[in-house]
Amino acid sequence: MALVPYDENVLPALSKLHQSSAEFTLANHRIRLSQDWKRLGVAAVVWDAAVVLCMFLEMGKVDLKGKRVIELGAGTGLVGIVAALLGANVTITDREPALEFLTANVHENIPQGRQKAVQVSELTWGENLDLYPQGGYDLILGADIVYLEETFPALLQTLEHLSSGDTVVLLSCRIRYERDERFLTELRQRFSVQEVHYDSQRDIHVYRAVKNKSNTEL
């Protein structure tokens, strides 16, 4: 996973990434997440895209009660945690190095009565997808997972595998570079995509995608 070096004195707003924890009030709960930039880098801090996606879920425009939800590239687990607090049955995934850290955040923030509704699992995009049910989810969530162009083919393959014709994909991201636009172009070749929310303060877009009928496995 790539790290982008920066001078903390030049970009003081990014100093929050080096804090050992981050706190939020979402889904009527106080959520406290551990962060560990030095050990795990970008996977272990809360990015604006995750916060915006959580706020979008709070709006109630997506029915989460009892739904089968999977989060990709979960990092700190914020989005999956909020989805679970809003009533979903959630599989929260990331690569193996982040799992211990991710699991601790989940256990810390999910009430005992909801623990069985949440599963933390290893998922490297494009690998061992047969471990996950093909088209087996109502909702796929991803926050700030569109940034490394070399991962785009595997991410698209994973989205296709996990999606049925009824699955909704919600991706929250900042469009930084031409490569981000290229990903959206490739996504639109396989999914029907529309922007459903934009946070102008944070410059974060939320996209809704549903697999094109011609690409739905029979």
UniProtKB/Swiss-Prot annotation:
Keyword Phosphoprotein tagged: no
Biological processes, Gene Ontology terms: protein methylation
Keyword Methyltransferase appears in the UniProt entry: yes
Cellular component terms per the entry's GO annotation: cytosol; protein-containing complex
Enzyme Commission number(s): 2.1.1.-
Keywords on record: Cytoplasm, Methyltransferase, S-adenosyl-L-methionine, Transferase
Catalytic activity entry: L-lysyl-[protein] + 3 S-adenosyl-L-methionine = N(6),N(6),N(6)-trimethyl-L-lysyl-[protein] + 3 S-adenosyl-L-homocysteine + 3 H(+)
Domain of life: Eukaryota
Annotated compartments: Cytoplasm
Main location: cytoplasm
An MF annotation (GO) of this entry: protein-lysine N-methyltransferase activity
Name of one Pfam family that matches: Methyltransf_16
Positions annotated to bind S-adenosyl-L-methionine: W47, G73, A74, G75, D94, W125, A143
EC primary class: transferase
Role according to the record: Protein-lysine methyltransferase that selectively trimethylates residues in heat shock protein 70 (HSP70) family members.
Protein family: Belongs to the methyltransferase superfamily. METTL21 family.
Protein name per the record: Protein N-lysine methyltransferase METTL21A
